[in-house]
UniProtKB/Swiss-Prot annotation:
GO terms for cellular component: plasma membrane. Gene3D superfamilies: HIT family - CDH-like. The chain crosses the membrane at residues 5-25. This is CDP-diacylglycerol pyrophosphatase. It holds the Pfam family CDH. The keyword Oxidoreductase does not apply. Its EC number is 3.6.1.26. The lineage of its organism: Bacteria, Pseudomonadati, Pseudomonadota, Gammaproteobacteria, Enterobacterales. GO terms for biological process: CDP-diacylglycerol catabolic process; phospholipid biosynthetic process. InterPro entries: CDP-diacylglyc_Pase (IPR003763), CDP-diacylglyc_Pase_proteobac (IPR015993), HIT-like_sf (IPR036265). It is found in: Cell inner membrane. It catalyses: a CDP-1,2-diacyl-sn-glycerol + H2O = a 1,2-diacyl-sn-glycero-3-phosphate + CMP + 2 H(+). Belongs to the Cdh family.
């Protein structure tokens, strides 16, 4: 009986993985890279016009792009080839701190909205290798889900300065959480914090998704989840975001 149960579980996992694979590759996984390298960057360099991006910073190595999903969602992407969280380049000291740059770009949301958006309503997220649809590194700059905001507010005093399991999980998935100051976030990439501080993470970075959220006391919470097909977790940190920005209508 036990063998039958394990077999059925294995079949379910294989089918789930196959479904994820189809979902991921049924479109063009290089679409964002083509926009950055073939449109935004050449237009900026040749015509000083970032279109179709909102901003292009060749020397700093990044662009900001308005995503088509959601009225206020933007993406921060590198101006050169980095696939995603699995890239060794993210652990190089010379690589830009893309999460900090993404946080600095949150003003585009307010500009698009027409009003100031409080930092507490903003979140940053990057999905794992299996949890993404595009093979060009992109950090989602968007609103946080109201229920996630409430949970993190309630857990404020229980989140440590070390990576520890977040009490109660998030969205039904296990997350690690770590509190950092604004200065720490500005000086050190969350990718490096995860790789250097979580056992075995460095060798399996592509399995992880990361998110960053501002807390009411001015600190930031780093969130990390590792893919686990047995629990149907593709490690898509974007799940904590709400691209419709319902949190703004409740304020």
């Amino acid at each position: 009986m036990k063998k039958t149960g394990y077999f059925l579980l294995a079949v379910i996992v294989i089918v789930a993985a196959a479904g994820v694979g189809y979902w991921k590759f049924s479109g063009n996984p290089d679409a964002l890279r083509e926009i950055v390298l073939e449109q935004c960057l050449p237009d900026q360099l040749q015509h000083q016009n970032p279109a179709p991006c909102a901003e292009v910073k060749p020397r700093a190595g990044y662009v900001v792009f308005k995503d088509r999903h959601g009225p206020l969602q933007y993406l921060l992407m590198p101006t050169y080839r980095i696939n995603g969280t699995e890239s060794p380049l993210l652990l190089e000291p010379a690589t830009p701190n893309f999460f900090w740059l993404a946080w600095q770009a949150r003003g585009y949301m307010s500009k698009k909205y027409g009003h100031d958006i409080p930092d507490s309503a903003v979140s940053l997220a990057i999905n794992s290798r299996l949890g993404r649809s595009q093979d060009h590194l992109h950090i989602h700059i968007s609103c946080i889900r109201p229920d996630v905001r409430e949970q993190l507010d309630n857990d404020l005093t229980r989140i440590s300065t070390r990576w520890l399991p977040l009490p109660g999980d998030l969205m039904g998935h296990e997350y690690l959480a770590r509190r950092v100051t604004e200065s720490e976030l500005a000086q050190r990439s969350p990718f490096m914090m995860l790789a250097e501080e979580v056992p075995e993470a460095r060798d399996h970075m592509g399995r992880y998704a990361l998110a960053v959220v501002r807390q009411s006391d001015g600190s930031f919470v780093l969130l990390a989840t590792e893919r686990n097909l047995l629990t149907f977790n593709r490690a898509s940190a974007e799940e904590i975001q709400d691209h419709s920005c319902a949190i703004l209508s409740s304020r």
